[in-house]
């Protein structure tokens, strides 16, 4: 994978009165395939480690794009890929778009536990013989921030270069926290004056991780944290559909953030909405 593809600067577009950072337009695998900032992070990680391993292993929710992202990346670098799931059945996996897409990219799917909890699956992954023999590398939820912090955060921060120098509101979906950390570090690095950063959480509380990591880089700052994850009735697995000016937002992430934005009182003309990625269509 050449450097130009890995570091492509995605555009900022004005659509129906609001600015969007279009990380969903990072599509090195082609239209409709896995895409976005999380794919770039995974590809940069595997670009760094692929000469030392024969394959990769990941474990995640049956609804998470991490499985097909990891599988597609492994295929691009000529590596094997194994995906560990838990708490499901083979017939269920054959019906769900993310496992199906991972299999289409060549992943070996294993139902490794009765529970789908990430800590249980990670425990099992660590004890795989190929992992113990250092033939396979485990790609974690959050794409291995602790081991490869500089390269991953630097890649996200670099995407801040082309946003406007002055912004009233930046709205960003927050899951694992890596994209949020990288974007906030980029605001400091590229001297962007963003008056209000709104992190809209679709996962567990990452504020401690975000602040501690940014402090190491001298880039810590205040932000508004909006917790959807613990809101009554919220479900990560339940899709929500939203379209803005022809942009179909990811039903598990940005679509839910857009629903929050619609009720927030923020004005579109004062806001940049960061899209981390789009739902891949190839697995449907």
Set out the residue ranges of the language-model regions.
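Positively charged, low-complexity intrinsically disordered leader regions
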Residues: 1-54
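Gly/Ser/Thr-rich loops at beta-strand to alpha-helix junctions
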Residues: 60-68, 90-91, 172-182, 253-257, ...
């Amino acid at each position: 994978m050449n450097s130009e593809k890995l570091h492509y600067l995605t555009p900022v577009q004005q659509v129906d009165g609001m600015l969007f950072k279009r990380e969903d337009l990072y599509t090195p695998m082609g239209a409709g395939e896995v895409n976005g900032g999380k794919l770039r992070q995974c590809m940069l990680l595997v670009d760094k480690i692929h000469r030392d391993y024969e394959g990769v292993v990941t474990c995640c929710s049956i609804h998470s794009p991490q499985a097909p992202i990891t599988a597609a990346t492994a295929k691009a670098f000529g590596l094997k890929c194994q995906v560990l799931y838990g708490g499901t059945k083979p017939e269920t996996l054959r019906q769900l778009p993310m496992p199906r897409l991972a299999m289409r990219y060549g992943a070996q799917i294993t139902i490794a536990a009765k529970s789908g909890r990430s800590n249980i699956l990670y425990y099992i992954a660590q004890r795989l013989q190929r992992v113990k023999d250092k033939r396979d590398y485990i790609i974690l939820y959050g794409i291995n921030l602790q081991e490869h912090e500089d390269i991953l955060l630097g890649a996200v921060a670099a995407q801040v270069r082309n946003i406007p120098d002055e912004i009233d509101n930046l709205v960003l979906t927050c899951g694992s926290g890596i994209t949020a950390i990288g974007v906030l570090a980029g605001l400091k690095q590229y001297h962007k004056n963003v008056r209000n950063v709104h992190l809209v959480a679709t996962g567990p509380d990452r504020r401690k991780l975000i602040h501690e990591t940014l402090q190491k880089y001298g880039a810590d700052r205040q932000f508004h944290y909006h917790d959807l994850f613990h809101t009554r009735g919220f479900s990560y697995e339940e899709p929500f559909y939203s379209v803005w000016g022809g942009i179909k937002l990811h039903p598990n992430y940005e679509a839910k953030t857009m629903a929050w934005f619609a009720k927030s009182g923020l004005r579109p003309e004062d806001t940049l909405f960061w899209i981390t990625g789009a739902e891949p269509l190839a697995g449907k």
